[in-house]
Curated annotation (Swiss-Prot):
Native source organism of the sequence: Chlamydia trachomatis serovar D (strain ATCC VR-885 / DSM 19411 / UW-3/Cx)
Gene, per the UniProt record: hisS
Protein name (record): Histidine--tRNA ligase
Keyword Transit peptide included in the entry's annotation: no
Keywords, alphabetical: Aminoacyl-tRNA synthetase, ATP-binding, Cytoplasm, Ligase, Nucleotide-binding, Protein biosynthesis
Assembly and binders: Homodimer.
One GO MF term: ATP binding
Superkingdom of origin: Bacteria
Class in the EC hierarchy, top level: ligase
Cross-referenced CDD domains: HisRS-like_core (cd00773)
GO BP: histidyl-tRNA aminoacylation
Length: 428
């Protein structure tokens, strides 16, 4: 029986070192996830974790004509014939959780999550059937400064992990008046060439007109480029809001560009929408996106509550970091003690516990290999520091620690070595 994984999934594994699969190394994931936790904490957002599967109706609310609902979800019946769906995106699940905990609901609810999502994606580079998303939802406040604040948080995350050439592409879908006028103009524009559009866009013409602008089909691109711009139909109130957000982005030094063709792949978005892209020459590709969804909470059975959020695919973030040449170390600042005999075994066991209590990640090599082989293992596994302990070290109480990355050593009595290791770890 084959033990191979199904298509579209992968292991995040600690010992991956090959350049092709380095993005799957768990140390890289820990670094990126740590940056997300740290930045969200700085902005006052709290972590939320929702179940891997929920009632299918939870995700139907993201839009009847969204690709996710129509063809990309993993849905199954349980033993009692109830329809359940593996979580395809985070926003609907967070809204459901907020309403389930309505007694604890605040006027301003600020959540973030780092969770696996499941979609039946076509097999292509950077797209997986289980993928991991860093997402954020701010529910309860509608204000240009809230939108700018969330975009600032996202920008800080990209900077913290080391991404380069980032830019925020923004558009404004507007309120009911703006959308009604724009839909009328779009319908008239596409009507005369409807039979030349892709089958999917012809379907969207009757079901969800705005989504034609999101088409990636080659036969649609000529018409999308010539389509009316929503910015020509935006009313004064919407324009004032949009301008206020852009002014704050400019003040924060966030690189942005207005893209009047930008719409999002889920039906619940209103007003401001955006994509975070990395720009390479004349090409760009998205590393995250989101926007405002002021009607979803009410559509889900709750009170009318404005909301703004985003989702970031961590696979693409890590792959892009490596493609941009970031020197991401796959190792942690870890000490390996190598006892050379049984007497040293007992000392290393005791000392390792003491070092861990000092905050130094410490492991012991119990293999009793020859020193040369033990050092090679440590180098191959990217251990930061190594200390060999034998009869002489125990007798003199003088220890030599080798820095494996700098190929240098430092030595001293036990307490001196401990102080140096604490310094090295804290200043890594």
């Amino acid at each position: 029986m084959s033990n191979a994984l199904p298509k579209g999934v992968f292991d995040i594994f600690p010992y991956v070192t090959s350049p092709k699969n380095l993005w799957r190394n768990s140390s890289l994931w820990k670094r990126v996830e740590h940056a997300a936790h740290r930045i969200c904490n700085l902005y006052g957002f709290d972590e939320i974790r929702t179940p891997v599967f929920e009632k299918t109706e939870t995700f139907l609310r993201v839009g009847e004509y969204s690709d996710i609902v129509k063809k990309e979800v993993y849905t199954f019946l349980d033993k009692k014939r109830r329809s359940l769906t593996l979580r395809p995106e985070g926003t609907a699940a967070v809204v459901r959780a907020l309403l389930d905990h309505s007694a604890d609901m605040r006027k301003d609810n600020k959540f973030y999550y780092i969770l696996p999502m499941f979609r039946y994606e076509r097999q292509q580079s950077g797209r997986y059937r289980q993928h991991h998303q860093f997402g954020l939802e701010a529910i309860g406040v509608r204000h240009p400064l809230r939108d700018a604040e969330v975009l600032s948080l996202l920008w800080d995350f990209y900077a913290a992990v080391g991404l380069q050439h980032m830019q925020i592409h923004v558009n404004f879908l507007g309120g009911q008046k703006t959308r009604a006028r724009y839909d009328e103009a779009l319908r008239e524009f596409f009507r005369k060439d409807l039979d030349r559009l892709s089958p999917l866009s012809q379907e969207r013409y009757h079901a969800n007109l705005l989504r034609i602008l999101d088409s990636k089909e080659p036969e649609d691109q000529e018409f999308i480029e010539k389509a009316p711009s929503i910015l020509d139909y935006i009313d004064d109130r919407d324009l004032s809001y949009f301008d206020a957000v852009l002014a704050q982005l400019k003040a924060l030094g966030i690189s942005f560009a207005i893209n009047p063709r930008l719409v999002r792949g889920l039906d619940y978005y209103t007003d401001l929408v955006f994509e975070a892209v990395t720009v390479v020459g004349e090409h760009s590709y998205a590393l995250g996106g989101g926007g405002r969804y002021d009607e979803l909470v009410a559509q889900s059975g709750g009170p009318s509550m404005p909301a703004f959020g985003f989702g970031v695919g961590l696979e693409r973030v890590i792959q892009t970091l490596l493609e941009q040449g970031n020197s991401l170390s796959t190792s942690t600042r870890r000490l390996r003690l190598i006892p050379m005999d049984e007497q040293a075994d007992a000392f290393c066991f005791s000392w390792a516990n003491r070092l861990r209590n000092l905050g130094i990640a410490t492991e012991v090599d119990w293999s009793h290999k020859k020193p040369k082989l033990s050092l090679k293992d440590a180098a191959d596994q990217q251990v930061s520091f190594v200390c060999l302990l034998g009869e002489q070290e125990l007798a003199t109480k003088q220890f030599i620690v080798k820095d494996m990355s700098l190929h240098q050593s430092f030595s001293g009595a036990q307490q001196d070595v401990e102080q140096r290791l604490v310094y090295e770890v804290q200043n890594a």
